[in-house]
UniProtKB/Swiss-Prot annotation:
Keyword Cell cycle: no
Residues annotated to bind NADP(+): G198, A199, G200, R201, M202, S203
Name this protein carries in UniProt: Glutamyl-tRNA reductase
The protein's enzyme class: oxidoreductase
GO molecular function, one term: NADP binding
Catalytic residue list: C50
The protein's annotated pathway: Porphyrin-containing compound metabolism; protoporphyrin-IX biosynthesis; 5-aminolevulinate from L-glutamyl-tRNA(Glu): step 1/2; Porphyrin-containing compound metabolism; chlorophyll biosynthesis
Source organism phylogeny: Bacteria, Bacillati, Cyanobacteriota, Cyanophyceae, Synechococcales
Key words, A-Z: Chlorophyll biosynthesis, NADP, Oxidoreductase, Porphyrin biosynthesis
Length: 435
């Protein structure tokens, strides 16, 4: 049995591939159900974000477990294994453990040190527990990954000043505005006519960053008016005009900058729609949705400038170099947490022997206690019987403490195996026969 992770990310696959594997919140239970019924998979959890889809698992056999997960991904995405496999990565054992620690710490993110991934890993843990897909191994691994992410942010400066996907999108808009004026600098968005499509968490972050860059007025477009208004009320210093998605064409005609961030599974803006829009100036569209909210056929369309999450790399690379040294400190924390987990996992090898040893000594204790109590006669009170029984239990616990502690202590697999064999032989435990 082993720990394995299979997935893809912005490092291995373009957005047009990632969006085909994205699993929406509505489809998560169905995905868990499919994976849970596979006889190769013992425990499983799913991490699905705009930049990655990763499936963490505890499997009977690494090769068979990885194949089962790849088969699921092919069926889910509609891609053949020959199309999908070049974009997938898979790790097992220590590599899988280190990977999830790095992910939670923000070290594998498009934006180094970004904080949103930690919330997404927490959500992965919650969803795995709610869908009864995680057992003791993944529970321990993923909760420790969350702790690692918190340590990285509290014990290093990696999270300080880190940009997020939303802030990178705003900076990309500033950069492209500057480039359109022949300047390689971030321009103020104060005079831009801004619209945001979507009223979720990413849109909230967009408004925060736009406000900090001089934007004091914008349109917020959503499928439901109520959710848009609720978000607008949280920003009293920004003049936010709410509209329904049905009125999107009006914003396509009158805005100069539109951000899209909805959970729609299909594009809401495509070339056919934009060709019907009459404009006097270029409309800049920045899509941070996965699956994409803006169709790929918009790129290259005259009068429109479209960008997706993969284009954020242009902004991110401007901020990364100064953070690399801090990242080395975070990597050291990740290595430390990885070792702690692997030592715990290795110690589980001793559990069957420890349980049999405890059971064997407990049988002896009960037998000898019964003999002693029978010799005490009827004059021996119930209180005195409880004292003697507690004494016998205390003796057993004292005897077990040192060997159990030593068996669970960090050591090489070969040394632990020798210790287990010695105890099994001396106490005639017969572990191999019982398994």
């Amino acid at each position: 049995m082993n720990i394995a992770v299979v997935g893809l990310s912005h490092r291995t696959a373009p957005v047009e591939v990632r969006e085909k594997l994205s699993i929406s919140d509505d489809n998560i239970p169905s995905a868990f159900n499919t994976l849970n019924t596979n006889d190769q998979i013992i425990e499983v959890s799913i991490l699905s974000t705009c930049n990655r889809l990763e499936i963490y698992s505890f499997v009977k056999n690494s090769d068979n477990g990885v194949k089962a997960i790849k088969d699921f991904l092919c069926k889910h995405s509609g891609l053949g294994i020959d199309e999908l496999d070049p974009h997938l990565f898979s790790y097992d054992q220590a590599e899988a453990v280190k990977h999830v620690m790095r992910v939670a710490g923000g070290l594998d993110s498009l934006v180094l040190g970004e904080g949103q991934i930690l919330s997404q890993v927490k959500k992965m843990v919650r969803l795995g527990q709610e869908n009864h897909s995680m057992g003791p191994i993944l529970n321990r691994l993923l909760t420790q990954a969350v702790s690692t992410g918190k340590r990285v942010r509290s014990e290093t400066n990696l999270g300080t000043g880190a940009v997020s996907i939303s802030s990178a999108a705003v900076e990309l808009a500033q950069l492209k505005l500057g480039q359109s004026e022949g300047k390689d600098e971030l321009m103020s968005l104060e005079r831009e006519k801004v619209s945001i499509v979507g009223a979720g968490r990413m849109s909230r972050l967009l408004i925060q960053h736009l406000q900090s860059k001089g934007c004091s007025k914008l349109k917020l477009i959503n499928r439901t008016f109520q959710r848009a208004e609720a978000l607008a009320l949280d920003f009293p210093d920004v003049d936010i005009h709410c509209q329904l998605l049905d009125d999107l064409d009006e914003s396509l005609r009158n805005s100069t900058l539109i951000f899209t961030s909805t959970a729609a599974e299909n594009p809401i803006i495509d070339a056919a729609r934009l060709k019907e829009v009459v404009r006097d100036e270029t409309l800049r569209l920045i899509d941070i949705g996965v699956p994409r909210n803006i169709s790929s056929d918009v790129k290259g369309l005259t009068g429109f400038e479209a960008h997706d999450v993969d284009d954020l790399q242009e902004v991110v690379s401007r901020n990364q170099e100064a953070r690399q040294q801090i990242a080395l400190e975070a990597e050291a924390l990740v290595d430390e947490e990885g070792r702690i987990f692997l030592e715990w996992w290795a110690s589980l090898e001793a559990v069957p022997t420890i349980n049999l040893l405890r059971s064997s000594l407990e049988s002896v204790r009960k037998e000898e206690l019964q003999k002693a109590l029978s010799r005490m006669g009827p004059d021996f009170s119930a209180r005195e019987r409880k004292v003697v029984e507690a004494l016998s239990k205390g003796i057993i616990n004292k005897i077990l403490h040192t060997p159990v502690t030593n068996l669970r202590a960090p050591q090489t697999s070969s040394n632990r195996k020798i210790s287990l064999e010695v105890i099994e032989t001396l106490f005639e435990l017969g572990v191999s026969e019982s398994e």
